[in-house]
């Protein structure tokens, strides 16, 4: 099925690429895609295109990669050129998903139907850069996707629609990301179909109550503080998979922890002390309860189930992980 509503798309990672693919495959014309500049990545630190750029190039869609869209920012010439390109490209609406650049009011006003953002939380909870991680870390029972009409604030625009999903006790950021990316892709296509049909999308202002901010994940947050309750540390491990992973230092070596669960245990050992080692898991005393680690990675190694990890590394009851220093 082909459509007439012309969509400029702005996004960068896999989450955004899923939405772009759905919009394009639904038959909406996409005359231009904006995505962040190529970045060094991988062991060789070679420049790599974003998932959104790769999809656009594979399907013959024009791509622009301005480092900024703010005329008064660090890259005024590139921002001005990109804004002029937007003005010169006939389109009806702009869709934004995990783009990573601030859109000034001047840009928000270009498209006749404005800019629609696909945000991976139930707004106003978890506005900001890392809503999926923070929802798991906080122990939220559910999260979802919100479509909003963008304004100049940070994820403060009026809400168009939402879809909810439960957060399972086994969900990681990776699994929840994929589920939300699929849900967001469907939701935006449905919204674009309605916008084309009726010429408008109803929206309601975000409530003032319940707003929280999802800070970007910092590498130092990976370190587990064993003085905290085991249930919180288990959520931290799930929230930080695939990045940056849970980290624990033993005898100067930093181990990555990729899978762990809280266990009910009245441990008298000091927090961080290994109290049990078996092929089923490494149990570590916490401030409250204990954490059973079932997947680990040593420096330079691969993620391994604990049984395989123990075949090449020695862990013993009585050893103690270092206590993370507060940042």
Curated annotation (Swiss-Prot):
Swiss-Prot/TrEMBL keywords: Protein biosynthesis, Transferase
One Gene Ontology molecular-function label: methionyl-tRNA formyltransferase activity
Enzyme nomenclature, EC number: 2.1.2.9
Family: Belongs to the Fmt family.
SUPFAM superfamilies cross-referenced by the UniProt entry: FMT C-terminal domain-like, Formyltransferase
Cysteine pairs bridged by disulfides in the record: none
PANTHER family: METHIONYL-TRNA FORMYLTRANSFERASE, METHIONYL-TRNA FORMYLTRANSFERASE, MITOCHONDRIAL
Function: Attaches a formyl group to the free amino group of methionyl-tRNA(fMet). The formyl group appears to play a dual role in the initiator identity of N-formylmethionyl-tRNA by promoting its recognition by IF2 and preventing the misappropriation of this tRNA by the elongation apparatus.
Keyword Iron-sulfur tagged: no
Signal peptide: none
Binding residues annotated for (6S)-5,6,7,8-tetrahydrofolate, in chain numbering: 121-124
InterPro entries: Fmt, Formyl_trans_C, Formyl_trans_C_sf, Formyl_transf_N, Formyl_transf_N_sf, Formyl_transferase-like_C_sf, GART_AS, Met-tRNA-FMT_C
Reactions performed catalytically: L-methionyl-tRNA(fMet) + (6R)-10-formyltetrahydrofolate = N-formyl-L-methionyl-tRNA(fMet) + (6S)-5,6,7,8-tetrahydrofolate + H(+)
Principal EC category: transferase
Protein name, UniProt field: Methionyl-tRNA formyltransferase
Pfam annotation, one family: Formyl_trans_C
Gene Ontology cellular component terms for the protein in this record: cytosol
Keyword Protein biosynthesis: yes
């Amino acid at each position: 099925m082909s459509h007439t509503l012309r969509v400029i798309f702005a996004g960068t990672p896999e989450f955004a690429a899923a939405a772009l693919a759905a919009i394009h495959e639904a038959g909406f014309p996409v005359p231009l895609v904006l995505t962040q500049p190529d970045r060094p990545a991988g062991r060789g630190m070679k420049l790599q295109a974003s998932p959104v750029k790769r999809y656009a190039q594979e399907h013959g869609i024009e791509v622009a990669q301005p480092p900024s869209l703010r005329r008064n920012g660090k890259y005024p010439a590139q921002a001005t050129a990109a804004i002029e390109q937007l003005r010169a490209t006939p389109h009806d609406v702009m869709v934004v998903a995990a783009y990573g650049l601030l859109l000034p009011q001047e840009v928000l006003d270009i498209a006749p139907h404005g800019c629609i953002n696909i945000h991976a939380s139930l707004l106003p909870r978890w506005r900001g850069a890392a809503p999926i991680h923070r929802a798991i870390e906080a122990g939220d029972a559910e999260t979802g996707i919100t479509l909003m009409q963008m304004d100049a604030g940070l994820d403060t625009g009026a809400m168009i629609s939402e879809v909810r999903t439960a957060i399972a006790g086994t969900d990681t950021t990776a699994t929840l990301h994929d589920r939300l990316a699929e849900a967001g892709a469907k939701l935006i296509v449905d919204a674009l179909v309605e916008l084309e049909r009726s010429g408008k999308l109803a929206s309601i202002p975000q409530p003032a109550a319940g707003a929280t901010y999802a800070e970007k994940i910092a590498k130092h947050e990976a370190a587990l503080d064993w003085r905290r309750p085991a249930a919180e540390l288990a959520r931290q491990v799930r929230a930080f998979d695939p990045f940056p992973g849970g980290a624990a230092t033993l005898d100067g070596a930093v181990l990555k922890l990729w899978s762990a669960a809280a266990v009910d245990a009245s441990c008298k050992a000091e927090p961080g002390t290994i109290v049990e080692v078996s092929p089923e898991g490494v149990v570590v005393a916490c401030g409250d309860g204990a954490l059973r680690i079932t997947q680990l990675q040593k420096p330079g190694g691969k993620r391994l189930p604990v049984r395989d990890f123990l075949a090449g590394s020695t862990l013993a009851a009585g050893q103690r992980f270092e206590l993370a220093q507060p940042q």
